[in-house]
């Protein structure tokens, strides 16, 4: 027969796609179960372990939607879930939070990682209906001028007209976030074709 060791698995989730400086600890989320008891065939294991259930994109958080994670799929090899709890739900408390929509002008867009030898023109004049969530006391005073938009072109290599996702955030407010996806239209040209000079390698 196999001798098992009883241990506690403490759960956590990781929030991805967070803007610079965002305070993840301020998010009002909770797990349906913070921890469960498991048994492990590895007798020298620690009495507790931290287990990441998975990731949640911050842009998908609207304080209403819940996220489900399967417990057994994240346990270590050989560990047995003793509780009968198969799913952990991550939910959010919307009390004290609200959302607003903003229109952000083109001059608040910063381009990063322009491809070598390319010129980039932003065709979009403004980004409408940008949905922002945050604490009510901040949302009551925040304005469109408080937002910065990052257009990161590190994944772009070819010329042409494309729609590209942007990151919207408020540098002065680290507890607000943008819900959903926002895009701008850009035109990418070879410098040689627009300036009649040779492109730089």
Regions found by a protein language model. Name each.
Residues 1-201:
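Structured interface patches
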């Amino acid at each position: 027969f196999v001798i098992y060791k009883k241990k506690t698995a403490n759960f956590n989730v990781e929030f991805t796609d967070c803007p610079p400086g965002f305070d993840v600890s301020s998010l009002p989320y909770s797990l349906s179960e913070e921890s469960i008891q498991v048994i492990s065939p590895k007798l020298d294991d620690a009495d507790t372990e931290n287990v990441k259930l998975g990731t949640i994109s911050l842009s998908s958080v609207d304080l209403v939607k819940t996220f489900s994670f399967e417990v057994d799929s994240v346990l270590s090899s050989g560990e047995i879930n003793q509780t009968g709890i198969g799913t952990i739900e991550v939910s959010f408390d919307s009390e004290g939070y609200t959302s607003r929509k903003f229109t952000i002008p083109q001059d608040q867009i910063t381009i990063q990682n322009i491809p070598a030898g390319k010129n980039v023109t932003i065709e979009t004049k403004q980004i409408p209906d940008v949905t922002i969530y945050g604490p009510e006391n901040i949302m009551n005073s925040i304005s469109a001028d408080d937002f910065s938009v990052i257009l990161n072109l590190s994944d772009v290599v070819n010329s042409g007209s494309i729609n590209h996702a942007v990151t919207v955030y408020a540098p002065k407010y680290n507890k607000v976030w943008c819900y959903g996806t926002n895009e701008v239209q850009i035109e990418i040209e070879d410098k040689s074709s627009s300036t009649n000079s040779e492109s730089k390698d």
